[in-house]
Structure formats: C-alpha cells, structure tokens
C-alpha cells in the first residue's frame, strides 16, 4: 500500500491529496487565464521576457525540428519556436489546463502564427506521445504546479529523442540574502494585492508565492533531472536566482 506521503502533495503551504491538488491547480489557472499575460508583465516588470529569450537562446532549436512547449500556456515560447523550426518543423503547445490552452491558441492565431503548431491538452506526468519523438522540450513556469514532478521528468525523458534536450525555466531560490528578503516581502504582501486589483483574485497569486517557496532549489532539481535519466545537467541563475534555467540532455 502507498504511504500517506505518496498519496499527498503540496498545494502552496498546504498538504492535500494528490487528486485534490490537480483540481485546485486547475481552478487557479482557469481563474487567471484571461489576465495571465498582463499579470506576468506586471509581476516581473517585464523581465519574464528576458528569461524566456535566454531559454530560447539555450535551446539549440534548428529548422525542421520538433519541439514540445509543455505547460505552454499563452504561447510565448511557441511563437518563437514556430519561426525557428520553419515550415518543415513542428511545435506542439501542450497544457493540462483547457482555459490556458484556449487563450494560447487564440493569441497565436490572432498573430497569424498557424501553420506548424498543434495544440494538445496533456498531463506532464503521462505525455501522450511516442518514445523518442521530440528534439527539444521546454517547460516554463509549469513544473512547480505538477503534482508528481519526478514522474513528469521521466515522462519528458521518454518522449525526447537521443541527442535531445530539456529546458526547465522556473522560479527558484535567490542566492543573495538581501535579495531574498526583498523578494519575500514582495511575493507575500504586494503580489496578492496586484492579483486582487488586476485579476480580482488575490488567492491565486498567494498560491503562486507559496508554490515558489515549496519548489525544489537549484541543486535539488538538478539531482531530480539526473535521476530521471538526463545527462550533463546544469543550470543558470537568472536575476540573482529568483529564476533558474535548468538544461539536461538525453544521450
């Protein structure tokens, strides 16, 4: 029988049943989907665009390749990858949340980005793709919301081609003490107020702050990726470690 720890997961600072967490996370993103892009700009002062640009630069994606933008949400990375892979390539924007997927699809279609993109509602823990299928997988600000992160990493490894790479862009642990103090004050006191003012939803942004604190730190996530099978795993601290980009390869 599974232990109690195996049956539960963190939802922010709370411990809940795993199936309950999936429902609760879904409710958060159904709530914030319409204001997601605006809130990203406000919360990060636009810096999220620099973090994502760095992820693109580290991806090594080339023409005619197949890319999975997992937890791709409103499609920022998908839009860039679509141009990089060209007509002979393919980008799959996958997200477990139907509301986020809908916003992403409408956003990209309104920009005329259509031809080489497919949309799939998928759970990162059980990806509905063949083995050795993608040249590159990215998951941007999504892994911390996954219930079983180790299972998801193994699933990503399975569908990645030999020679392919995974990039995980995620909030992490600041490496400068003074920055950490300021960041905590901002996250727990200011961020929920912005969420209430802009999206009428302080609770979802309180969960965001808590989920960041519960997410594995840089070295722990590096070890988790290695345990899932990835080789040459390394990471880059961005903005003093507020965000980290982890990269691993499948050889």
From Swiss-Prot:
It comes from Pectobacterium atrosepticum (strain SCRI 1043 / ATCC BAA-672) (Erwinia carotovora subsp. atroseptica). Keywords: Menaquinone biosynthesis, Methyltransferase, S-adenosyl-L-methionine, Transferase, Ubiquinone biosynthesis. Belongs to the class I-like SAM-binding methyltransferase superfamily. MenG/UbiE family. PANTHER family: 2-METHOXY-6-POLYPRENYL-1,4-BENZOQUINOL METHYLASE, MITOCHONDRIAL (PTHR43591:SF24), METHYLTRANSFERASE (PTHR43591). It comes from the Bacteria. Pathway: Quinol/quinone metabolism; menaquinone biosynthesis; menaquinol from 1,4-dihydroxy-2-naphthoate: step 2/2; Cofactor biosynthesis; ubiquinone biosynthesis. The gene is ubiE. One of its GO terms (biological process) is aerobic respiration. HAMAP family: MenG_UbiE_methyltr (MF_01813). It catalyses: a 2-demethylmenaquinol + S-adenosyl-L-methionine = a menaquinol + S-adenosyl-L-homocysteine + H(+); a 2-methoxy-6-(all-trans-polyprenyl)benzene-1,4-diol + S-adenosyl-L-methionine = a 5-methoxy-2-methyl-3-(all-trans-polyprenyl)benzene-1,4-diol + S-adenosyl-L-homocysteine + H(+). It holds the Pfam family Ubie_methyltran. Methyltransferase required for the conversion of demethylmenaquinol (DMKH2) to menaquinol (MKH2) and the conversion of 2-polyprenyl-6-methoxy-1,4-benzoquinol (DDMQH2) to 2-polyprenyl-3-methyl-6-methoxy-1,4-benzoquinol (DMQH2). This is Ubiquinone/menaquinone biosynthesis C-methyltransferase UbiE. The keyword Ligase does not apply. Its EC number is 2.1.1.163, 2.1.1.201. Disulfide bonds: none annotated. One of its GO terms (molecular function) is 2-methoxy-6-polyprenyl-1,4-benzoquinol methyltransferase activity.
